[in-house]
Amino acid sequence: MKLGRDRSRREFIQQSAVLGTGVILTGVGAQRLFAQGNQRPDPAKMVASKGCAARDTSGKLSPWSFERRPVGDDDILIEIKFCGICHSDIHQLRGDWGPQKYPQVPGHEIAGVVVATGKNVTRFKVGDHAGVGCMVDSCGTCDSCRHGEEQHCDNDATLFTYGYPDKTSPTGITQGGYANNLVVRERFAIQLPRTIGLQNAAPLLCAGITTYSPLVKASIKKSDKVGVAGIGGLGHLAIKLAVAKGAEVYAFTTSASKVNDIRRFGAKEVVVVDSMEKLKPYNKALDYMISTIPVNYDVAAYASLVKPYGNCTQVGMPAKGEVTINNFAFNRNRVRYSTSLIGGIPQTQEVIDYCAKNKIYPEVQVIKASEVNETWEKVINKEARYRYVIDTATI
């Protein structure tokens, strides 16, 4: 059978899709768009911006000059220095997750320097390093928000970093980090220690938190046997984070060219899955499995590697948000299958601090903005080693 992702992911896809000129607006999400507390921005105080935007479902990016909202009392203005390229950027801009409004600037792995602050801001000052991940607002009052899980806002008010309806944005939607600057509420900005380079901090704001959060929830401990399926931007960080917690990591990849790198990341064993037969020796051998595979695949084949009543967590987001599950196979395996959606703001700060303290850095390849279209194709073709990061000074 086909199993869609959790409720929050479905609502995100639905609410970021376009109906006519813009957006499918349902329930509380629609009420929020038309009843936001912030007034229309004053055009005289708009922040001039430039970025790389897609104009249609081809996803081809080109230069675009646009405006962001003024810096409000609770906002900071970040001069973006680096922005990571996530496979989600490609899925969304090409319409894999539903129709989109264009022009749209992607990017939710944003690292830069604070250049202005609103009068109520207390956590940042000009010159501080700051980052922004996958969301820029939520209701702030529901149980999920109050417990630091803003990505699961009970009032459907999570405002994702790009392509989401936003009355305060001069373009009508949030615009992401393939750009030279960003205005964001202080509460949704992450403090970046100067002990970690901005190019290394950027991928942690999505790839890092997306893998860190389920590992923490699974209470991974020393000597646990942890499987990581799909070794790309997310998977290589999952390996490093699990190893840092003392786990024995078993990595599963379809790319033989990555074997030496994966061993360097700390994996105990690397399995090149060129046929499903390669999985059989590991049947019921693992304590936990995290899958970062971003395409539809046979979940049960990988989940069968986990011990009975163990856990398998899906964090990769396939096109249309669907993966294939064989219910008969799961009945036999007795494995608990779950999904995980990024992580809340407190936990995002936690993973940044944890990685800075333990010197856990992503493997990055810095590119110019002019190379972004060809780089997207490299991501699709599994050529990334292991996270491309845009030097936004080249925009």
Where are each of the predicted segments found?
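C-terminal hydrophobic helical "lid"/dimerization subdomain
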Residues: 2-7, 11-31, 37-47, 300, ...
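C-terminal segment of N-terminal export signals and the immediately downstream linker at the start
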Residues: 28-70, 79, 330
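Glycine-rich phosphate-binding loop and adjacent beta-alpha segment
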Residues: 35, 293-363, 392-395
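Glycine-rich beta-strand-centered segment in the early N-terminal region that forms part
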Residues: 43, 69-83, 96-146, 151, ...
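NAD(P)H dinucleotide-binding glycine-rich loop of Rossmann-like/cofactor-binding domains
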Residues: 139-229
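Adenosine-nucleotide cofactor-binding segment
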Residues: 222, 228-231, 241-299
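Hydrophobic/small residue at the entry helix of a nucleotide-binding pocket
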Residues: 234
